[in-house]
UniProtKB/Swiss-Prot annotation:
Protein name in the entry: Glutaminase
Reactions this protein catalyses: L-glutamine + H2O = L-glutamate + NH4(+)
Entry similarity comment: Belongs to the glutaminase family.
Pfam family, one: Glutaminase
E.C. number: 3.5.1.2
Transmembrane segments: none
Enzyme class at the top of the EC tree: hydrolase
InterPro entries, sorted: Beta-lactam/transpept-like (IPR012338), Glutaminase (IPR015868)
Subunit structure: Homotetramer.
Gene Ontology molecular function terms on file: glutaminase activity
GO biological process: glutamate biosynthetic process; glutamine catabolic process
Domain of life: Bacteria
Organism listed in the record: Serratia proteamaculans (strain 568)
Keyword Hydrolase tagged: yes
Amino acid sequence: MVTTLDNALLEEILQQVRPLIGQGKVADYIPALAEVASDRLAIAVCTVDGEIFQAGNATERFSIQSISKVLSLTLALTRYQEHEIWQRVGKEPSGLPFNSLLQLEMEQGKPRNPFINPGALVVCDMLQTRLSAPKQRMLEVVRQLAGEEDLAYDSRVARSEFEHSDRNAAIAYLMKSFGNFENDVLTVLQTYFHYCALRMSCLELARSFVYLANHGRDLSGREVISPLQARQINALMMTSGMYDGAGEFAYRVGMPGKSGVGGGIVAIVPDELSIAVWSPELDASGNSLAGTAALELLSQRISRSIF
C-alpha cells in the first residue's frame, strides 16, 4: 500500500532507522568532521512544485563534502561544451575507493567519472581555467538554488582537509604528469576543499537539487541546465554517485543519489521529488548508514523507484 508523503511519515521513518546509530563510523580522517555529533538524523523532501516535508535535524547545517561534486559538474556544464568535459573525465563506475590512485595510473590519468576524487579534481581544474573566482561563483550558484543568501564555506573544515591532502595532491600531480591537469595543483585543491566544505541543511539541499527532478529547472522556474543534461547527471548519480556502494544503493533505494562523507545523501525521483538525508555515521563504502536505510524505507513507503 502506498503511503501519503507528509511530515508524519518522515518522522516515522527516522524513528525506525534511529536504532542504527552507533553501528556506523563518523569520518575521522578529516579532524574537523570527526567532531560532529553522531546522533544527528534528518530528512527533507522538496517537490517540483516547491512543497516541503521534513523531520529531525532538517534545518541544521553540515559539511556536504562530495555532494558538491554534482554542483561543480553542473557549473562546468554551463561553461564548457560537453565533449570538452568528457575528453578529460569518463562516465563509468569505478568500483574502487573514491581516492584510488591505482586505476588512474592504469588508465593514463583519465578519471573514471566526475564523482570520485580524481574526476572532481579535473572538473575543479576546468572551472579554475574558465572562472576568475571559482569559490565565489559556486557560492552564488548554491545561494540562488537554495534561496538562502547566507550559505557559506566552513573555512575550518576546508583548512583541515587541505592540511591532510597528501593523497588528493598525489592524484592531481599524477593527472598533471599525464597532461590532464592545467592549473596550479595547490590552487585547485583549495577550491576543491572549499566546495566540499559547503555547509547546508537537508532542507537547503532538497530545495537546491530540485533542478535534477524538474528537467533542469530550479524552484523559480529558471533553467539551470538543459533537460538532457539533468537526465545525464541523474544517470551518472545512479551508476557512480555512491562511491563503491552504487550497486547496493540502486538495489535498496532505486533512485539516483549522491553521498558525502559528512553523512549527507541527496536522492532524486525524476519529475517529482528531491530528497536529502543526513546521519554522520558511515558504512564501509563511506555512505551514511542510517541515511541509506531512511531512503530505502521512504522508497518502499511511497512506492517510488526508477526501476
